[in-house]
């Protein structure tokens, strides 16, 4: 059906526990700290989508749910893409990696991933989340490879 609701995929926002997986060694931040120092109750803090009024460790304001990113990785991959030879599998490129949700999804789905992030804080959060994802079971049962390369940003 053209234009119907069945064309849409819905998933809830990433929970605080999902946002913070792999970040156990980072300090807990208040919503004000996560939004750049706004005070509780000030204009903008209550409606700020990235904070939702909860304490957490991930300072990134728009962490995507892993379930949504896994869905998009599968939808964007060509049929038959899961070749036993990892070198022949699709590559997911995320030029603005943020907190690394797309990379985590790619690892879990068993496809290759290249991510770039200029923001040092976000790059560190993404690195920690990707290291945590390294231990997650993948769809194909093989272990992913994470590489860190210096420069202006970080490449995973």
Model feature map: region roles:
Residues 1-156:
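Class I S-adenosyl-L-methionine
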């Amino acid at each position: 059906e053209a234009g119907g609701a069945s064309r849409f995929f819905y998933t809830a926002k990433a929970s605080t526990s999902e946002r913070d997986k792999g970040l156990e060694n980072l300090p807990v931040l208040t919503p004000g700290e996560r939004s750049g120092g706004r005070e509780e109750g000030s204009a903008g803090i209550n409606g700020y989508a990235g904070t939702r009024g909860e304490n957490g460790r991930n300072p990134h304001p728009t962490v995507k749910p892993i379930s949504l990113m896994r869905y998009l990785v599968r939808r964007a991959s060509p049929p038959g893409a899961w070749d036993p030879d990892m070198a022949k599998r699709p590559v997911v490129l995320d030029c603005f990696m943020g907190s690394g949700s797309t990379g985590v999804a790619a690892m879990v789905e068993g496809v290759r991933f290249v991510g770039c992030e200029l923001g040092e804080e976000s790059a560190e959060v993404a690195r920690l989340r990707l290291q945590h994802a390294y231990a997650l079971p993948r769809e194909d049962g093989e272990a992913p490879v994470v590489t860190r390369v210096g420069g202006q940003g970080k490449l995973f």
